[in-house]
Amino acid sequence: MSIISRRQALALGIAAPALLRFGSAHAGTALKISHQFPGGTAAEGDFRDRLCRRFAALIQERSKGAMTAEIYPGSSLMKTNAQFSAMRKGALDMSLIPISYAGGDLAELNLGLMPGLVTGYEQGLGWKNKPIGQELAKFLASKGVVIITWIWQAGGAASRTRPLVEVGDAKGMKIRGGSREMDLVLQAAGAAVLSLPSNELYAAMQTGACDAALTSSTSLTSFRLEELAKHLTTGRAKSYWFMLEPLLMSKALFDRLSNEEREIILSVGTELEEYGRSAAVEDDVRVAKVYEAAGAKVHDLDEAVVQKWRELARETAWKDYANKSENCARLLKLAMETGA
């Protein structure tokens, strides 16, 4: 198996020390896991970083040291928006990333942040063992990526001047929606939209380029938006914004692993799904306390408000997505069968 050259690595935006090392379990397999979130420890910090660290510890333990993994937080290995395509090429081993970030290249993946489609954790995590999850996993595999851990997160909105709760509140605001489909809904509601990863939100809000940001409950605190926001709309009660943000692996690497290594990786990945769910739910509650302590006014959504957002999404984002291709229409139909 060849190792990519330093020139190739630099062309892909990979830090020089992160040249990939593959090998059999006997020789030792060292994985590189990249993500955009702040780094911490296995016990403290952003739960997505903690989940990656737990994954690394568990595969090392189960393989008796034959497999190891190094975590690169804060997009320190490569830029956020380069990570998915790098996995497809075999130039990055693993990433924990919002799947909709790849929706520009693979329209099907915008399903991972389709407003109003998933409105609860049980529904979202239920995708894995239903036709929608099986078909989505099959599609990803055909594009060179394997889902290791299914993670869903509810989200909310942090805003600088006025709250973003009702559909009508969006009019005239500059809002980061988090996906192309969410942007379509916001534009229909009268907002201007901007597209950027969550680790760039602080600067955008600080400069006034962004009035409000929709992002996961965890990112609302990890990126310290409470320092800038006067209002928070939470996802702790109800939400129309649920994001699929799995731990992924390059299929090029996965296919080179031994059967034993694959079994360890998949079993550990599955075991961590309940941890991801409970941590996400905890953050849905914790974010409100953090923003209240910072002096922001906190708002919650009720079913009537969520339904209005969902109705707008059905007429805009859902239709747009279904019209992209027969495959998009098929995936949306399967997702709707889970309870949307």
Question: For the regions a protein language model found, what residue spans apply to each?
Answer:
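N-terminal secretory/targeting leader peptides
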Residues: 2-5, 10-20, 26-123, 132, ...
